[in-house]
A protein has these predicted regions:
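FIC/Doc superfamily catalytic core
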Residues: 1-73, 77-142
């Protein structure tokens, strides 16, 4: 809607990022390469959809998407939404990263960018357990 087109009185940017952005201390894909990088990511997904376990597929897609960081804002939310769509489509529960774990989430992604994906996978699986425990506790109350 038109209301969403403004953010703090400034027109909200549309489309892919126009300026470089940095996540933590890591550079992301340059604006002029975003479209190609996303096409390659989609091709990677299609190629691996039937070969790779859905959990690994979703986590790896999310990691790669965040490395591209195609928009000026909202990349984390969008990336987690896509990751959870992949998980839900395969019968797995979504992964919720709670606000209090935001810094640890950024650190896990940074380590993954350095090639230490085990830390990232472990962190995300811990979030899955927390979400499951929350759902289980909530269900018991009713």
């Amino acid at each position: 809607t038109k209301d969403l087109e403004m953010q703090k009185g400034v027109p909200y940017p549309r489309g892919f990022k126009k300026m470089p952005n940095i996540v933590g201390n890591s550079e992301t894909t340059a604006p002029e390469h975003v479209e190609l990088a996303l096409k390659e990511l989609i091709e990677w997904y299609k190629k691996n959809k039937k070969k790779v376990h859905p959990l690994i597929l979703a986590l790896e897609f999310h990691k790669r998407y965040e490395e591209i960081h195609p928009f000026q804002d909202g990349n984390g939310r969008t990336g987690r939404l896509i990751m959870n769509k992949i998980l839900l489509s395969s019968g797995y529960q979504p992964i919720i990263v709670y606000k209090e774990n935001k810094l640890a989430y950024f650190n896990a992604l940074a380590k993954a960018r350095e090639g230490r994906t085990k830390n990232y996978y472990q962190f995300m699986l811990e979030q899955t357990k927390k979400a499951y425990d929350f759902l289980e506790d909530t269900a018991r109350k009713y």
